[in-house]
């Protein structure tokens, strides 16, 4: 079957193939920026899974007698750039981890949407081998997203909130001290004027 949905399907496959190649480079950087050992492991484990996704996509191309070729995925490229910007921020470690999880989940959700469509199209066109391979990738993307969610809700988000509260607590005494100093300075002239009045 050529033309129509087949061409759109192959186009989406090439987009997904490029996305996985980009993520192969990005995931180790997310791992390196992570403070949590569990989060670092999650990113590195998913990088290994991503290598498998690349291999399976190549099998999908072969099953369709299509040339293995990627097409630049602007969507994932944008998500990766946002992740790089986050890593340049001066956040406390827990907040950085929370933001890295958010970045990782953005890419997972993008891929889940893409693979969900690819599975549906493969089934509609009777490409059972391709559908099975793509479904296996989709299942791993969902599992990776769930793992990140567990890490976020299992302590990292709470640690980030606690860190923000501690920062506010540290700033409050200094702010009160500055405020107190300003009040004293304003009162001083009035106090001296009162003394002059008494001397008269």
Model-flagged regions — what are they?
Residues 1-200:
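Amphipathic alpha-helical hairpins
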